[in-house]
C-alpha cells in the first residue's frame, strides 16, 4: 500500500477504495452457532453462510470486484465459439503474464487436471516446493507421486525468513539424480505457498530452479494463482527488485516458467482459470483436453461475463495499491495477535493470517485434529469461519494410516478489499479470548470420512463435551452479547 503516516504514530492499514455496494451480515447467538457447527460435523466447510458473520474461509472467489470489472461484464460477447471476450482475455494474458497461448478452464483445479492428464505418466514424480490439496489429489489419481522440497527452515513457523516458499536447490538436484530425469514429469513452483502460511518464493530462487530444470531438460510449471501477492512481497523483501514495477516482477516470474496456470478466483478477483505458455508443442498436448473436460477453447466452461471480468482483473493485479491491501491487513492482524501472545506464522504471508494451531492447542493430540478443533471452537465463540490447514487436510497412506501434516494451522483468509478494520479488530478480540481459554478446547474424530478431499465433505464429532464448556465460559464472560 502507499505509505501514509498517522500523526500520533499509529500503524494501521489504510483502505484506498470506497464501499459502494454492500451485503448485510448476521451475527447469530452462540446457541445457534452451537447448533450450526454440530450440524456441520465440526467442519467449517459445511456451515451455511446464513450462520456465518465474517467468512474468512478462503479468498477463492470471494475477493471484491472493482467497478471496472462489473462494467466490463456488460460488454460480454456471448458466443459458444470465437467470442471477442476470449480475445480480450488472451490479450490481457499476453500483456500481464507474457504468454501467447491460452487455454481457459473453469477454475484452478481444472487446470491441474488438464496438466496432469497431458504430462504425468503413472509412476512418475512431480517435484514441487509444496503441494496444494487439489494438485496432490490429481497427481495421486493419475498414479503419480509428489516430492516436496522446501528448505528446512520453511516449516519453522515463527522466523524472519522472508522467502519460506523457496525450493531447496540441493534437494532438487539430488531428487532428479535419484529418480532419473526421465521419471520426473515436471517441476512445479507454487507462488505464495498456500499450505505453509501463504509464504512467497524469491526470484533468485526461481532462477536457480530454472537453471536446474534446463540442465536436466525438465519442464517448469508455475502455479500463479497468488502470483500478484508473491510479486508484491518480492518488491517488499528482495533487495534486487525493490525498484522494479509489479509488471516487471510478474513478467520475470512467468518468463522463467514453461507453463503457467492459475485460478482466476484468486489471481484476477473473478471466477475461472487458465493455462498459458509460449511453447506451441505444450499447448497442442493440452488442446483437446479442454473441450473434453471443460468446454470449447474460447470459453472453457467459464461464463463469458466472467471472462470479461477476468481480463480487467488481470490488469488490475499490476496496481500495487490494490494488490497490497490484503497483505497489509494480514500483517496488521498477525502483528497485533503476536502482541497478545497468540502464536502466529511469521513473517506474515498472503491469503490470510495463519494461527499456529499446534501450539495454540498443544494439549490436543495431532491425531485428534487440533487445527480442525480450533477452527470449530473459533467459529463457536465468534461467528468467524476460518479454514483448517492441518491433518484433516492431509490423507491416509495405502494402508489407511493417517499421514500427519507437517504443520497444524488455522487460516483466517483476508479476501481483497472485503473486511473493514473494525471487523478485523473484532476477529482479533475473539481470538484473544479463545487463546486465554484454550485449555477448554478438545479434540475431534471422524464419523464420516470420504476417501478423497475429506476436508471438504468429512464430518466429525467432538471427543468430549468441550464445546458446551466453552459456551458456558463465553456466556459467563460476555453475558448476553452476541
Cite the ranges covered by each PLM segment.
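Conserved PLP-enzyme active-site core in the AAT-like
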Residues: 2-42, 55-64, 69, 78-102, ...
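C-terminal, active-site-flanking charged/polar segments
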Residues: 22-29, 66, 373-380, 432-434
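Short, solvent-exposed beta-strand edge segments and adjacent coil->beta transition regions
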Residues: 272, 350, 407-411
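Short beta-strand-to-loop capping motifs
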Residues: 277-278, 355-358, 414-416
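Short, conserved charged micro-motifs
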Residues: 284, 362-370, 417-426
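Conserved small-domain helix->loop->beta segment predominantly found in fold-type I
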Residues: 298-309, 313-376, 380-406, 442-452, ...
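PLP-dependent enzyme catalytic core of the Aspartate aminotransferase-like
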Residues: 393-482
Amino acid at each position: 500500500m502507499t505509505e501514509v503516516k498517522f500523526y500520533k504514530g499509529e500503524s494501521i492499514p489504510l483502505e484506498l477504495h470506497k464501499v459502494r455496494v454492500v451485503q448485510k451480515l448476521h451475527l447469530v447467538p452462540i446457541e445457534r452457532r452451537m447448533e450450526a457447527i454440530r450440524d456441520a460435523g465440526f467442519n467449517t466447510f459445511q456451515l451455511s453462510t446464513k450462520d456465518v458473520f465474517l467468512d474468512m474461509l478462503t479468498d477463492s472467489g470471494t475477493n471484491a470486484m472493482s467497478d471496472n470489472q462489473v462494467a466490463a461484464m456488460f460488454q460480454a460477447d456471448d458466443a459458444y465459439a470465437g467470442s471477442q471476450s476470449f480475445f480480450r482475455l488472451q490479450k490481457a494474458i499476453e500483456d500481464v503474464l507474457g504468454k501467447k497461448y491460452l487455454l481457459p478452464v473453469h477454475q484452478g483445479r481444472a487446470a491441474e487436471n488438464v496438466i496432469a492428464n497431458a504430462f504425468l505418466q503413472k509412476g512418475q514424480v512431480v517435484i514441487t516446493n509444496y503441494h496444494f490439496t487439489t494438485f496432490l489429489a490429481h497427481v495421486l489419481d493419475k498414479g503419480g507421486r509428489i516430492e516436496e522440497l522446501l528448505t528446512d527452515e520453511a516449516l519453522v513457523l515463527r522466523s524472519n525468513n522472508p522467502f519460506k516458499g523457496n525450493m531447496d536447490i540441493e534437494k532438487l538436484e539430488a531428487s532428479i539424480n535419484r529418480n532419473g530425469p526421465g521419471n520426473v514429469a515436471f517441476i512445479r513452483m507454487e507462488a505464495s505457498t498456500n499450505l505453509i502460511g501463504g509464504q512467497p518464493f524469491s526470484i533468485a530462487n526461481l532462477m536457480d530452479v530454472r537453471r536446474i530444470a534446463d540442465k536436466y531438460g525438465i519442464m517448469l510449471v508455475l502455479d500463479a494463482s497468488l502470483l500478484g501477492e508473491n510479486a508484491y512481497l518480492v518488491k517488499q523483501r528482495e533487495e534486487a527488485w525493490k525498484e522494479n514495477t509489479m509488471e516487471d516482477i510478474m513478467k520475470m516470474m512467468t518468463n522463467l516458467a514453461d507453463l503457467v496456470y492459475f485460478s482466476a478466483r484468486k489471481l484476477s478477483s473473478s471466477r475461472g482459470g487458465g493455462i498459458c505458455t509460449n511453447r506451441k508443442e505444450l499447448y497442442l498436448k493440452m488442446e483437446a483436453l479442454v473441450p473434453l473436460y471443460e468446454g470449447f477453447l474460447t470459453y472453457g466452461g467459464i461464463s463469458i461475463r466472467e471472462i470479461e471480468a477476468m481480463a480487467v482483473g488481470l490488469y488490475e493485479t499490476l496496481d500495487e495499491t490494490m494488490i497490497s491491501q490484503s497483505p497489509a491487513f494480514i500483517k496488521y492482524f498477525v502483528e497485533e495477535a503476536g502482541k497478545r501472545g497468540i502464536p502466529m506464522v511469521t513473517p506474515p504471508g498472503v491469503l490470510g493470517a495463519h494461527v499456529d494451531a499446534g501450539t495454540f492447542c498443544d494439549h490436543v493430540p495431532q491425531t485428534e485434529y487440533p487445527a480442525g478443533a480450533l477452527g470449530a471452537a473459533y467459529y463457536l465463540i465468534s461467528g468467524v469461519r476460518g479454514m483448517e490447514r492441518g491433518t484433516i487436510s492431509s490423507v491416509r497412506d495405502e494402508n489407511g494410516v493417517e499421514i500427519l501434516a507437517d504443520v497444524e494451522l488455522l487460516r483466517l483468509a483476508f479476501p481483497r478489499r472485503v473486511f473493514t478494520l473494525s471487523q478485523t479488530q473484532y476477529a482479533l478480540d475473539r481470538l484473544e479470548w479463545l487463546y486465554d481459554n484454550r485449555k477448554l478446547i478438545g479434540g475431534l474424530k471422524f464419523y464420516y470420512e470420504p476417501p478423497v478431499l475429506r476436508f471438504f465433505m468429512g464430518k466429525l464429532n467432538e471427543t468430549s463435551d468441550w464445546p458446551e464448556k466453552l459456551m458456558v465460559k463465553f456466556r459467563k464472560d460476555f453475558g448476553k452479547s452476541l
